[in-house]
């Protein structure tokens, strides 16, 4: 990323990537953050107040990006692809709005079988709250192998596809905090809060602690998490 480039942050959420991009492309560049969630965009707008160049925040569907062909030098999608029902359509749109030789960079959590500690959390939520809770906790994990992700990108038209697997430690001070922080920004937050002073929450914590026993040390819980990092060119 260099000064003057035009950048699209797809599924921008609270705008962390867009703000970082704005610092790099400078006053002669352009940064657009696109998301379909009004609440996320409100947080992003507030957090970006005073950043130059002015970041443009747009509410839109990533399957129908409201920009012309070849409008951007770079498209980012950080931890967003896994949430789109039609991933192929989103990638085709990303390809369309990139200029020739434009770049795509995305990240997504690897399948949950490669992140078994989160599967244990999902199982625990399923037992104590219900099937929908488990399903929601599994939704941030892209259900594609490395080769399937590569094929998906190539089928959208991308070239020079490179995929890396990042493995990094995740640490929480306690099992209780693991549960609370992981569901804090999800629709489950209210249900967890309603249990927080209840015996059922304590039972749920003990249940998960037993499942995560081999990952507990004197500072809390620590385990490896696996993420895809993919880059490609139009």
What are these regions (language model features)?
Residues 3-4, 27-28, 98-104:
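Short glycine-dipeptide loop
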Residues 6-65, 74, 89:
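Class I SAM-dependent methyltransferase SAM/SAH-binding core
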Residues 14-16, 140-234:
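Conserved Class I S-adenosyl-L-methionine
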Residues 25, 48, 125, 153, ...:
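Conserved hydrophobic residues forming the short capping helix/wall of the S-adenosyl-L-methionine
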Residues 61-64, 68-69, 86, 145:
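Acidic/polar helix N-cap motif
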Residues 73-87, 110:
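A short SAM/SAH-binding and catalytic strip from SAM-dependent methyltransferases
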Residues 88, 96-173, 189:
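Conserved catalytic/acceptor-binding region of the Class I
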């Amino acid at each position: 990323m260099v000064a003057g480039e035009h950048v699209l942050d797809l599924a921008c959420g609270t705008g962390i990537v867009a703000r970082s991009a704005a610092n790099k492309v400078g006053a002669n560049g352009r940064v657009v953050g696109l998301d379909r969630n009004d609440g996320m965009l409100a947080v992003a707008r507030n957090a970006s107040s005073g950043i130059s160049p002015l970041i443009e925040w747009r509410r839109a569907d990533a399957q129908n990006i409201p920009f012309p062909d070849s409008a951007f030098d770079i498209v980012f999608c950080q931890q967003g692809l896994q949430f789109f029902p039609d991933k192929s359509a989103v990638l085709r749109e990303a390809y369309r709005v990139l200029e020739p030789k434009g770049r795509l960079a995305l990240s997504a959590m690897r399948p949950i079988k490669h992140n078994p500690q989160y599967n244990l959390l999902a199982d625990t939520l399923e037992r104590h709250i219900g099937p929908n809770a488990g399903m929601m906790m599994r939704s941030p994990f892209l259900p594609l192998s490395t080769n399937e992700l590569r094929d998906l990108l190539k089928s959208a038209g991308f070239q020079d596809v490179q995929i890396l697997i990042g493995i990094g430690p995740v640490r929480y001070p306690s099992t209780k905090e693991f549960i609370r922080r992981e569901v804090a920004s999800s629709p489950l937050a209210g249900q967890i809060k309603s249990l927080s002073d209840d015996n059922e929450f304590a039972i749920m914590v003990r249940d998960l602690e037993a499942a995560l026993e081999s990952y507990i040390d004197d500072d809390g819980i620590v385990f490896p998490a696996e993420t895809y990092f993919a880059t490609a060119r139009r």
